[in-house]
Amino acid sequence: MLNFTDVTEFILLGLTSRREWQVLFFIIFLVVYIITMVGNIGMMVLIKVSPQLNNPMYFFLSHLSFVDVWFSSNVTPKMLENLLSDKKTITYAGCLVQCFFFIALVHVEIFILAAMAFDRYMAIGNPLLYGSKMSRVVCIRLITFPYIYGFLTSLAATLWTYGLYFCGKIEINHFYCADPPLIKMACAGTFVKEYTMIILAGINFTYSLTVIIISYLFILIAILRMRSAEGRQKAFSTCGSHLTAVIIFYGTLIFMYLRRPTEESVEQGKMVAVFYTTVIPMLNPMIYSLRNKDVKKAMMKVISRSC
């Protein structure tokens, strides 16, 4: 008979047990977190105050920045606290909350990226109908679905996490409460959780990625039909930022969640998780601003008005 324990908290093993590395990581991730907050909040404010950015593309981008703020804030503050603390713990309730928001925000982000791909197709493939087809009402509907679906999916996934049983050590080999190390640590109730995690991740990633791939196939066809070299260059420039963000985000998530949790995969996943929980939210504003002339112009106007 299994010796189940009434878990009240978990120990987060984090990235390293060496004190000198912990201090270094604290400084690095604090700087990354500050840049993430400034970049994403700055992007939201810029889109809000700039009339030239008042179109569907930047409407979706503002929501992507909003999700990245919460995505990073769900993990980073607790990680920073534990890097300097001798007691590297998280309560059971705190762990479930972290799991809930993490899964919800991942699903919201992948479907926002899909909506952005569809928006780019409408702008490039049907420019004359773009204004009527991508109206404010349509954009609100497209952005509402990811939030509702993401949070409902996360609620179900978190309830399955709640059904896990733990015995013996309650050490999570990670720097936040992630599903793979929790499943690896559990001693019962893992079957449903493990396979629903893989199936749900597979279905949602496949569906959203299919929308993106189909949208880009139509975009490519539309670009090849363009007679103007300048038009082609502008279209490629517009899509390049989004495509870069898609490849980085999906690549890391697929590596993390579409494999059965093993000791090796959990250890590898921990390194990958650093990238998509801290680095990607920091990079997104840079990706979308450095390669976007409209954002640069809007930024210069705001700076010139404030000087």
Swiss-Prot record:
Membrane side Extracellular: residue ranges: 1-23, 74-97, 159-194, 257-269
Residues passing through the membrane, by range: 24-44, 53-73, 98-118, 138-158, 195-215, 236-256, 270-290
GO cellular component term, pick one: plasma membrane
Family note: Belongs to the G-protein coupled receptor 1 family.
Cytoplasmic side: 45-52, 119-137, 216-235, 291-307
Name of protein: Olfactory receptor 5M3
PROSITE patterns membership: G_PROTEIN_RECEP_F1_1, G_PROTEIN_RECEP_F1_2
Any single GO BP term: G protein-coupled receptor signaling pathway
SS bond list: 95-187
Gene3D superfamilies: Rhodopsin 7-helix transmembrane proteins
Summary of the function given for this chain in its UniProt record: Odorant receptor.
Source organism (scientific name): Homo sapiens (Human)
Main localisation: membrane
Membrane disposition: Multi-pass membrane protein
Keywords, ordered alphabetically: Cell membrane, Disulfide bond, G-protein coupled receptor, Glycoprotein, Membrane, Olfaction, Receptor, Sensory transduction, Transducer, Transmembrane, Transmembrane helix
GO molecular-function terms, A-Z: G protein-coupled receptor activity; odorant binding; olfactory receptor activity
Annotated InterPro entries: GPCR_Rhodpsn, GPCR_Rhodpsn_7TM, Olfact_rcpt
Pfam families named in the record: 7tm_4
Localization in the cell: Cell membrane
Sugar-modified residues: 3
